[in-house]
Amino acid sequence: MKNRIKGHLTEIIVLVVAALLVAADQITKGLITDNFYLGQSVTVIPNALNFTYIHNPGAVFGILKNHPWVFNTVTIIAVIGALIVLASGRVGKKPYIWAIGLVISGGVGNMIDRLSLKYVVDFIEITFIYFPYVFNVADCCVVIGCGIVILQVVIEMIQEFKSKKAKKAKKAADITHLTEENVDE
């Protein structure tokens, strides 16, 4: 039993962190709904960050707002699938494990809102650049998780390219070395 737990320690830690992130998401949303009225905006950092309380009846950035069942179904399937993949232990690289944990936490955090409230509570508004969307902690988790996957894929592509280049250079050097040996004979 100890070896089995030890073999999945990263996954266990990731799930604990994911649960804490879901809690943080729900606590921050609760603080906003308890202390703000709908539509209220408060400057947190001038020209950088506002807290603006809105209801988002759709998915990310308000898409699918007239078809919540579609997004609820997709989210449930995605979260269950991610949990199965994580539990399988087949995700070898830690960045992917952490990315899955972040996506799970974001999906669960927003799913709790959709199922209990029929909308998602959003409140984080970036004002230092033009970004017309208001979002929440769960959205941040999903975006960061997806960003980690993209970054890891790019890193792996670069490593694979360098590895292939090194193999070609070695093969060329071996051919040159063999040719020189044949000339010497």
State what each model feature region is:
Residues 1-185:
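Alpha-helical transmembrane bundles and membrane-interface segments of multipass inner-membrane proteins
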